[in-house]
Amino acid sequence: MHALLFDLFGLFISEQSRTSFETLARTVGVEPDVLLPAYRGENRVEYDAGTIGSREYWARVAAETGVDIDWQAALAADLAALGAKDEAMVSFARSLNRTGFTMGMLSNIPCDFVGWTRWHNPWSDELFDPVLFSCRLRLAKPDEEIFAVALARLSQSAGRKLAPEDVLYVDDSPKNVEVATKLGFLGHCFENLEALSAKIEAV
């Protein structure tokens, strides 16, 4: 293994909690169980891939739920629902960075979330190169093409051509890890820091 490629949310920033989602649902005026399919389905894939913006995304959610939604208020509530930084994981990444590993980040994220994420998490640009956001690539995981782009960018950072088997890909989504390993990457489905540390030592 010569390089590491990490997801962001669910590893370094906690996933949106049920309580946060319920607060978001109240803001937009939709019952949580009604909101969830429209919020998480194909609309979110396109939103993450940057093929639609926040206004169109929330217009689609409104159409599917039958509720008139103020998209700007919804966006603000969506940003407020983002999770907290995991200090232990960030410290672990710093220790890995000092060992000389090439480390990249690949995150599914809408364009309107990028500025907020970078502002509140400046360590991401300090520790990872490249930092790749799906919306700027016009692709979203688990699309196979996004992994090819990430591998090429990791190779640039490493100063040598990397093969998929040179890279350990870490994500909390089993589907994303499944696709990456099918393409030849080493894979680890993240559950906790202890298991991740053991995996890195093993490879």
Task: Go through the PLM ranges and name each one.
Residues S91-R94, R98, A152, E178:
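Surface-exposed alpha-helical segments enriched in charged/polar residues
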Residues H2-S91, R98-T99, P110-V114:
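N-terminal helical cap/lid subdomain that shapes the substrate entry/recognition surface
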Residues M103:
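Extracellular ligand-binding interfaces
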Residues T99-G100, V203:
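Structured helix-beta-strand junction loops
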Residues H2-F6, L106, P110-C111, G115-V203:
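Asp-based, Mg2+/Mn2+-dependent phosphohydrolase catalytic module
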